[in-house]
Amino acid sequence: MASSKLLSLALFLVLLTHANSATETSFNFPNFHTDDKLILQGNATISSKGQLQLTGVGSNELPRVDSLGRAFYSDPIQIKDSNNVASFNTNFTFIIRAKNQSISAYGLAFALVPVNSPPQKKQEFLGIFNTNNPEPNARTVAVVFNTFKNRIDFDKNFIKPYVNENCDFHKYNGEKTDVQITYDSSNNDLRVFLHFTVSQVKCSVSATVHLEKEVDEWVSVGFSATSGLTEDTTETHDVLSWSFSSKFRNKLSNILLNNIL
């Protein structure tokens, strides 16, 4: 009997290893290089300093007017598998530098978008949406660091937020900013933690999001940013590092383990 349980346990571990390799995705960019697995769109580029520059910078090192840039991990990420939904965790560090910190626009977003989707409208739409009205076909969820309105927004399929929290980006202009975003599919909980590393000020916001209803089975994950329409409202958007991991709840493994024990 004992040997049978040991054999079953060994089989379980083999199956678990295979299942995890099939349902987990992870990557880490401590800095960025031109040969990284990234899709760059618009004005996005990798700087000589190893930073991901989303919006354009002129020869005078000042931000370009009405610039748009997007960068997504090149491999699609599976979010849904039948009735199973992945949880994910992402950490990144960015710096937004405004020419005039009191009136800059528009901000930076972390987004889950349809695979192979092109850039959308500029300005307040941040390159990820096209309208102020609901777009069911947009199939996009975004966490927006909205410098125009000094807040963190959660957007689903159009630019108007369904949840937001004040966060004074203008006041902490140019600071290195650490962000963690987590999604727990077991309770549909999306959370954002933001930390301005110099001033030690923190912002956080959370909401219930049924991700399986809002995005496609496979998505692209990454960033999009836009800069203001006039020189006084321009800003740069640089991502310094980025890591991401996602994992499905392994229902089959739980069933097998309960039967063994």
Curated annotation (Swiss-Prot):
Supply the residue numbers of the propeptide(s) excised during maturation.
255-261
* Keywords recorded for this protein, A-Z: Disulfide bond, Glycoprotein, Lectin, Plant defense, Seed storage protein, Signal, Storage protein, Toxin
| Superkingdom, taxonomy of origin | Eukaryota
Kinase as a keyword?
A: no
| Keyword Glycoprotein set for record | yes
Q: Which residues cross the membrane?
A: none
Where in the sequence is the signal peptide annotated? 1-21
Q: How is it modified after translation?
A: The C-terminal segment appears to be highly susceptible to proteolysis.
Q: For this chain's UniProt record, which GO biological process terms are given? A: defense response
Glycosylation site list: N43, N91, N100
Q: Name one GO molecular function term.
A: toxin activity
**Self-association state and partner proteins as the record states:** Monomer.
Biological function? Seed storage. This carbohydrate-binding lectin has toxic effects on bean bruchid pests.
Q: Which family does it belong to?
A: Belongs to the leguminous lectin family.
- What is the recorded name of this protein? Arcelin-5A
Q: Which organism is this entry from?
A: Phaseolus vulgaris (Kidney bean)
